[in-house]
Every structure is written in structure tokens, then in C-alpha cells.
Amino acid sequence: MSNDANVSKRDGFRSRGGFIIACIGSAVGMGNIWRFPTLVSKWGGMTFLLPYFLFVILIGSTGVIGEFALGRAAGAGPVDAFGMCTEARWGKRRPGELVGYIPVLGSLALAIGYTCVMGWIFKYTFLAFDGGLSAMGQDMDGIVATFNATASAWGANVWVVVAVAVSFVIMSFGIAGGIEKANKIMMPILFLLFVGLGIYVATLPGASDGYRYIFTIKPAGLLDPYVWIYAFGQAFFSLSVAGNGSVIYGSYLSKSECIPSSARNVALFDTIAALLAAFVIIPAMAAGGAQLDAGGPGLMFIYLVHVMNGMAGGRIVARVFFVCVAFAGVTSIINLYEAPVASLQERFGLKRVPATAVIHVIGLAVALCIQAIVSQWMDVVSIYICPLGALLAAVMFFWIGGKKLVLESVNLGARKPIGGWYYPLCKYVYCASVLVALVAGAALGGIG
């Protein structure tokens, strides 16, 4: 709940740096690795990056700040945060609390789908170290068959269990002792390893063609509305505005911390991570003589495996790459499971470990059953439920909560208070953009 007595009992981040790193960890995920480079390649390098940067600035300075501030103001996850907003407007918490379960369930659904993907990632990380990946060589039929078997019904049971176990262990130690500590270890290593991969790939013959393409801008391409739509979609989903993860992490933030500054850092480092992935994958594909025309799991588990097996030092590259992917996945999945875990604690008074166990048992049971349809599962969640959660959070905070609550919440602890421009920008421009994400995603079969 959001009263002071209960807030004081809650776990939280020990430091501003820990909060920022954890939020970066939640944002840096598969979208940065298997979707962003594909979009950069498909839509013309810098032609795509320019609108992408603009949308990162817009969403980072509106939605990310807003969700952090909403969570901190309530001192709770989406259920109580939405209840706080309806109470501020109408004196009734119940309507907001009921609506707040939508993004919580969305977070759980996305976490379950992610659990399946993490099973694949752990399996391929193991194969990279035991020689299984390199043994396939460049036999595309064998590479495809291995992935198809992995992504089939009951195809990665052991590794799905491993994924759930890793998440459960980290989260059982709480926010400071588990989530913050894990992110402080994994995120710096991820960035360092990606930089190392980028340096190595840059030395490969033919890699320069990939870099040249990334930095090419075609002015005519900027007139294509689809470039802007997909750039917006990628920025929107990459920054993890969905009314759940950012809200719950914000609820653990000290009231003395500067939220606008934290949001800027999250947006900056998420973008750096995405660019690092592009600077590794696009030149690597160019060096391997392959075209980057397929995104999603196929890029990571089929085409990149084929390319890495054909390059000098490919066995080492594969090991480093899949460790990076595993770290990105773990730091994202613990954020996705946190909102439902925290909701059990807040609504039913469960202790941390039992609440974590209940959610992870549910996650494991469903994940094992949906392995063959996880792509369709993730499409439904990401196209409809996540944007809906973001829209509900935006409407609750900026429309129902009202200007006074918004500005007080955002400026609490701010080194330089945000001016009057922030509220109308969020209320009208940001809320409208979230609605666009929902409608465009439904119309185009996903934009992020």
C-alpha cells in the first residue's frame, strides 16, 4: 500500500546508481539485440536512426519520467498506483486498483514468454561453451533443425527450468540484495563484452561495408511514414514503458532522487546498448557475406550462428555473444516478474520468498506448455497488452491524477524542477503517441 508505514517496510534500491543500472537492465533486452539491428538494416541505417533518436528523447523525457514518478508517488506497483490516481480525482481507490491489474497481468504474460526465450538462450550459451554450436559448422540445415527442435513443444524443458530457477534465486534476495546486485554485476560486463566484440568484428574483412551502411542517410527515406512508425515503435518498446516494470522500479526509489536525471541516463544507456548490438551484428553479417533481412529469434539462433561458425575466432565470438544475450535476458526477465511478485506482497501480505515462488511456479507451468506457440504468445502480449498498459498508466497519471499530482511527483528531489511544459506535453502528445503505438501495432502486426 502507499501509506508511509507500509512504504517504510518495503525493500528498495540502496543507491541511485543501482536504480539506474537496474532500469537499464530492464530496458536492454532482446529488442535491442535481435530487432534493433534488423530495423537499422531494413530502413536505411542513419535514415532510421535519426527519427529513432528523436523518439527516444520524446519518450524518455515524458513516459519514462512519468512511470518512475507514478510508482514513487504511490510507493507501490500499478494496482495501488492507479488506485492513488482515482482516489485523487474521485475519492475512490477501487476503480483504479481494478484497472491496475491489467498491466500486472501483462507483465506476467510477457515474463512467461520471455522465460521460454531464456530457455533457448541458456541452451545456446551451453552449446557455445561445449562445442555444440561450432560442431554444426555452416550446415544451415543442421542449424535450422537444431533451433526448430529447441523451439518445439517441450523442446527446451530443462533450460526453461534453468531460466526460472535463475530468476527465482535472484529475486528471492529482494531488490537491493538480488535485483540491484545482479544488475550491478551483469550490466557492466555486458557492455564491456559488447565493446570487445565490436572491436574484434571491426577487424574482419568486409566489416567496413556494414559500418558504411549504418552511417548512410537517404533523405528520401525520411519521407517514408513507415520509417517513422517503426522508429517510434522500437523506441517505445525499448524504453520499457508498459505501465508495469518502470512503475514498480520507481516505487523502490528514494524520494530524494532526481527522476528526470535517472530517466535520461536510462534512455542514453539503452540507446548505447542498442547501437553496440548494431555495430556488432550488421558488420558481422557483412563480413560473413550475409544480408540482415531477418529479425527475431531466427537472426540470433540461425543466421548469426551460421555467420559466427564461418568467421575466424567464431567459437570465442559465439561464447561472448551468448553470454551477453543471457545477461540482457536475465536483467529483463527479473523486471518483468517483479510487478506480479510485488502485487502479491502488497495485496495479500505475502513475504518475499513465498510471493516469488508462487509467481515463478505459475510462470514455469505456463512456459513449459506454450513453447511451441511462444512467438504467437509474445505477439499478442507485445502488440496489444503492453501498449494498453502504457496507455492506462498515462491516462491514470496525466489525465486522472491531474497536474498537481504529476508536477509534485516528478519534481520531488529534482535538482532542476521541470517547468510547466511537461504536463501538457505528456497529457496530449505522449498520451496520443501511446494510442498510436496501440493502433499502429494492431494494424501492422507489431511495430516494436
Model feature map: region roles:
Residues 14, 21-31, 107-111, 115, ...:
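Hydrophobic, membrane-embedded alpha-helices of multi-pass small-molecule transporters
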Residues 327-336, 355-366, 382-409:
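Hydrophobic alpha-helical segments of multi-pass membrane transport proteins
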Residues 2-13, 180, 184-330, 354:
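Membrane-embedded translocation segments of transport machinery
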Residues 18-19, 26, 157-158, 269-275, ...:
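Loop-to-transmembrane helix boundary motifs in multi-pass membrane proteins
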